[in-house]
Amino acid sequence: MTYKLILLRHGHSEWNAKNLFTGWVDVDLNDQGRAEAARGGELLVENNILPDVLYTSLLKRAINTANIALDKADRGWIPVKRDWRLNERHYGALQGKDKAQTLAEYGEEQFMEWRRSYDTPPPPLDDNSEFSQAHDPRYADLGDALPRTECLKDVLVRILPYWESDIKADLKAGKTVLVTAHGNSLRALVKHLDGISDEAIAGLNIPTGIPLVYDLDDDFQPVKPGGTYLDPEAAEQAILAVANQGKK
């Protein structure tokens, strides 16, 4: 038996367009992102891959991407599970900062270490910052678990228990699962699925709005490592654009 998992990074956001570090700041999609989300839903229909259950983060850019895609696929009625553990990586004190300015200020080596290394987080975000989530009611129950900064390793640590307890359980029940989340939370999950090394994960980019489908075997190993993008040509072009963020 194989299990079907669909990963969908949220569409282009207002801060993607402004080239800002976003993290846990709850910005919305822009027009491009809404169009990407709609196209993502159309791709699901065209390939007859329709989800039975949806997982999203608590951030509106992922929630709205899922809503638009599911509306296009006429699957707005499926069960929805939202959890903070699918949130984007917390970028600490970099949240709200311009990527190009950060690159110019700190140099490429430090910039890339913060942005792409597996285990080096940026400096923590002060709770009094306008970009802090310390007083956000959706995280009121987290207590000390609320991050002030994260590296990709931290994201993997929070996602894996949720993958094991919830997402995998729905897959085992024979459901086609859609996870609509973020660049780094999805990179962490793909790292686990594909067994990508701590070093190689730095080179993995996930494009916005293009469904990535994994067929998993009985041991939850990918039948095809890396999965399959439902629009491979668009994915290749978009991956290059993601890789070049901050260099303009």
From Swiss-Prot:
GO biological process, one term: gluconeogenesis
Residues involved in substrate binding: 9-16, 22-23, 61, 88-91, 99, 115-116, 183-184
This protein's UniProt keywords: Gluconeogenesis, Glycolysis, Isomerase
Matches recorded under Pfam families: His_Phos_1
E.C. code: 5.4.2.11
Pathway, per record: Carbohydrate degradation; glycolysis; pyruvate from D-glyceraldehyde 3-phosphate: step 3/5
Alphabetical list of CDD domains matching this protein: HP_PGM_like (cd07067)
Positions of the catalytic residues: H10, E88
This protein's record includes keyword RNA-binding: no
GO molecular function: phosphoglycerate mutase activity
Matches recorded under InterPro entries: His_Pase_superF_clade-1, His_PPase_superfam, Phosphogly_mut1
Transition state stabilizer, annotated site positions: H182
Domain of life of the organism encoding this protein: Bacteria
Reactions it catalyzes: (2R)-2-phosphoglycerate = (2R)-3-phosphoglycerate
Record-linked Gene3D superfamilies: Phosphoglycerate mutase-like (3.40.50.1240)
Role summary: Catalyzes the interconversion of 2-phosphoglycerate and 3-phosphoglycerate.
Family (UniProt): Belongs to the phosphoglycerate mutase family. BPG-dependent PGAM subfamily.
Protein name as catalogued: 2,3-bisphosphoglycerate-dependent phosphoglycerate mutase
Source organism of the structure: Pseudarthrobacter chlorophenolicus (strain ATCC 700700 / DSM 12829 / CIP 107037 / JCM 12360 / KCTC 9906 / NCIMB 13794 / A6) (Arthrobacter chlorophenolicus)
